[in-house]
């Protein structure tokens, strides 16, 4: 199913790059922002923006419930995590997908595998990489 509106669950340059790419392919974007990021470039570039809480990331950008709520509020049907802790959290992936929202990032299974370095090395060896 094609993405009709993308929520970018990150800030700064990575969010801006994703938004510029989305603009080129006509996908509207939603920015989320913490209190201290209200005037940031990624907020100004997005078609829509949603406040998600206080400055500490654990109280805003890493709060999956707030990201899901922002998707529902704006009609965003997909989330791009950018990079960082959210992009590496298999629990976040599962919660977002369980909410019926498309996750544009590594699958939860891959993240689980990569979290276990020994299993990851073995899997890479079996793939002859």
Language-model-derived ranges and their functions:
Residues 1-126:
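N-terminal beta-alpha lobe that positions the nucleotide/phosphoryl donor
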């Amino acid at each position: 199913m094609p993405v009709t509106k993308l929520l970018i669950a990150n800030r700064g340059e990575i969010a801006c790059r994703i938004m510029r790419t989305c603009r080129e392919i006509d996908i509207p974007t939603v920015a989320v922002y913490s209190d201290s990021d209200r005037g940031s470039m990624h907020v100004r570039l997005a078609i829509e923006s949603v406040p998600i809480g206080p400055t500490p990331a654990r109280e805003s950008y890493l709060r999956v419930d707030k990201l899901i709520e922002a998707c529902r509020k704006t009609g965003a049907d997909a989330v791009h995590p950018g990079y960082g802790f959210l992009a590496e959290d298999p629990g976040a992936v599962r919660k977002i997908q369980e909410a019926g929202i498309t996750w544009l990032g590594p699958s939860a299974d891959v993240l689980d595998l990569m979290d276990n370095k020994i299993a990851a090395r073995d899997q890479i060896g079996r793939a002859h990489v």
